Curated annotation (Swiss-Prot):
It comes from the Bacteria. This is Phosphate acyltransferase. The gene is plsX. One of its GO terms (biological process) is phospholipid biosynthetic process. Gene3D superfamilies: Isopropylmalate Dehydrogenase.
């Protein structure tokens, strides 16, 4: 199995990418990795090149660039070349911690959309209080969704949750403003009716306040709603930790309490860090394309590689294609 990784994408590239890749190589004996980027910079951190190949390029896509234009103009950019490795059959999947928009464009224009899938979805695994997490899609790839798009997201998310996350008969919920049948706008009502007859374990509408309680294993929504929910959860978690830190540092006695509580607080912080679950998968493409968090450290990159390897090994893409074909959606 071979995975191509954009070594220049992310806030801590290439160091975090290289260290994460070496960690994955040690863990998985069947894995080969191609690091795409500036060879001189990559080799500064590469202490072992066992089953690691470097594809040199001086070009990269900056986060400030317009995504589609950058992908079309910069054919030799590290992210584009990683996607090209997949298209050419040189890699089974690709990963990048670079620009989300650029990776979506590279996925569509280079890797290609799966036949029958109208719009791809961006899907991270979000944390829950019990540590199991849930898959959420879409969180920004498609802000103007149609009912058929969300139907397809539900099927793809269900396959992923079962194959990669090991959840038998995963619960699929539709993010809505209430749990009762008939709630929501016209899009929600149409999708609800379609999902009731889908070949999945549809548990009905779910509200955003219940997401972290693990009300569903897969949560489906349009990209606009999903992105707002994602950013709200991120912001709330950061604000709570910030307020907690301020209170714990407010007096001598509270500082003593903080010293005692620190190990438990670090466990809690790690549990709420969704980057530990891997990256956000771009569902609906011909091969696995994973968006690692922009601030990924080496452990986050390792988690994204582990996730990608599971998607390839468990044949997630062929399974999705087969299910869609059975549903006469292709």
């Amino acid at each position: 199995m071979k995975i191509a990784i954009d070594a220049m994408g992310g806030d801590h590239a290439p160091k975090a990418v290289v260290l994460g890749a070496m960690k994955a190589i040690k863990e998985y004996s069947d894995l080969h990795i191609t690091l795409v980027g500036k060879e001189e910079e990559i080799r500064q951190y590469l202490t072992s090149d066992e089953r690691i190949t470097i594809l040199h390029t001086d070009e990269k896509i900056e986060s400030t660039e317009e995504p589609v234009r950058a992908v079309r103009r910069k054919k030799q950019a590290s992210m584009v070349l990683a996607a090209q490795q997949v298209k050419d059959g040189e890699a089974d999947a690709c990963i990048s911690a670079g620009s989300t928009g650029a990776l979506m464009a590279a996925g569509l224009f280079v890797v290609g959309r799966m036949e029958g899938i109208e719009r791809p979805a961006l899907s991270p695994t979000m944390p829950t209080v019990d540590g199991k997490g849930f898959v959420m899609l879409d969180v920004g790839a498609n802000v103007d969704a149609k009912p058929i798009h969300l139907y397809q997201y539900a099927v793809m998310g269900s396959v992923y949750a079962e194959k990669v996350r090991g959840i038998e008969n995963p619960r699929v919920g539709l993010l809505n403003v209430g749990t009762e049948d008939g709630k929501g706008n016209e899009l929600s009502k149409q999708v609800f009716a379609m999902l009731k007859d889908a070949p999945i374990n549809f548990v009905g509408n779910v509200e955003s306040r219940d997401l972290l309680q693990g009300v569903a294993d897969v949560v489906v929504c349009d990209g606009f709603t999903g992105n707002v929910a994602l950013k709200s959860l991120e912001g709330t978690a950061l604000a709570l930790f910030s307020m907690l830190k301020e209170q714990l540092m407010s007096s001598f006695t509270s500082k003593l309490a903080a010293a005692v509580l620190k190990p438990k607080l670090m466990v809690l912080k790690d549990k709420m860090d969704y980057s530990e679950y891997g990256g956000a998968a771009l569902f609906g493409l011909k091969a696995p394309v994973i968006k690692a968090h922009g601030s990924s450290n080496d452990q986050s990159i390792f988690s994204a590689i582990r996730q990608t390897r599971e998607m390839v090994a468990k044949e997630v893409i062929p399974t999705i294609s087969s299910v869609m074909e059975k549903e006469s959606l292709q």
